Amino acid sequence: MAKKVTAYIKLQVKAGQASPSPPVGPALGQRGLNIMDFCKAFNAGTQKIEQGLPIPVVITAYSDRTFTFITKSPPASILLKKIVGIQSGSKRPNTEKVGKVTRKQLEDIAKTKELDMTAADLDAAVRTIAGSARSMGLVVEG
């Protein structure tokens, strides 16, 4: 018989830095899941990703207090800020530009996020990422 799913927990945890402190501890603790098991498994699973990069994770909690989790690619805004070298996007993106991004850089980000996006092809994914860049106050070249 299949295990009964009791909850889906969505979090953003820094790669290789999962610890029992918030947001991980309270989210898993209130569902009765073993926090340290998740932290060890998550940190082992994100070893190859740059440390400190926020990684979205979806944890599936089961009725017998076990869990599984799926990690996703980092948010596009984080990747864009990293490539351009800025701390935050523009407060007024239509009038105040904070940096430039090329089509090649957008393609690299789209390839990284390809599995998590619903875009039909790479070009559609690039257009989606370009929209995110524009809304952050970045100039899209190419």
Curated annotation (Swiss-Prot):
Task: Give an example GO cellular component term for this record.
Answer: cytosolic large ribosomal subunit
Q: Which InterPro entries match?
A: Ribosomal_uL11, Ribosomal_uL11_bac-typ, Ribosomal_uL11_C, Ribosomal_uL11_C_sf, Ribosomal_uL11_CS, Ribosomal_uL11_N, Ribosomal_uL11_N_sf
Q: What PTM annotation applies here?
A: One or more lysine residues are methylated.
- Keyword Ribonucleoprotein annotated: yes
Pfam families per UniProt: Ribosomal_L11, Ribosomal_L11_N
Q: Which family does it belong to?
A: Belongs to the universal ribosomal protein uL11 family.
Role description = Forms part of the ribosomal stalk which helps the ribosome interact with GTP-bound translation factors.
How it assembles, according to the record, is: Part of the ribosomal stalk of the 50S ribosomal subunit. Interacts with L10 and the large rRNA to form the base of the stalk. L10 forms an elongated spine to which L12 dimers bind in a sequential fashion forming a multimeric L10(L12)X complex.
- Protein name, entry field: Large ribosomal subunit protein uL11
What is the organism of origin for this protein? Xylella fastidiosa (strain Temecula1 / ATCC 700964)
Q: Which gene encodes it?
A: rplK
